[in-house]
């Protein structure tokens, strides 16, 4: 039974490899990133920029790698989940890195203004 599951996982990895993006920079929780997203409106497509703090990251090295990004849109906090290997994502750029001690930053949801700032790492 175990041999069949390993064969299946190897088969899944071989199918996923061509679809995994290689030009994505290393993104950690707490980073402030800028993300380009292709949005289709009617018959036209345009690129929408989204900038925010990464609250969570899931499945680091697979095709299903996703991250939760918290953006501020017109003074309201908006959280969106993005799949990094999606063809709709055109680019990802790390703007700022922060010193954090948590794996998930969900506590930032409750903080407002200066209380929600993270300590920046200067490298």
From Swiss-Prot:
Chief location: plastid
Single biological process term from Gene Ontology: translation
GO cellular component terms attached to this protein's record: chloroplast; mitochondrial large ribosomal subunit
Molecular function GO labels: structural constituent of ribosome
UniProt keyword list: Chloroplast, Plastid, Ribonucleoprotein, Ribosomal protein
Subcellular location as annotated: Plastid, Chloroplast
Domain of life: Eukaryota
Protein name: Large ribosomal subunit protein bL19c
Species name: Pyropia yezoensis
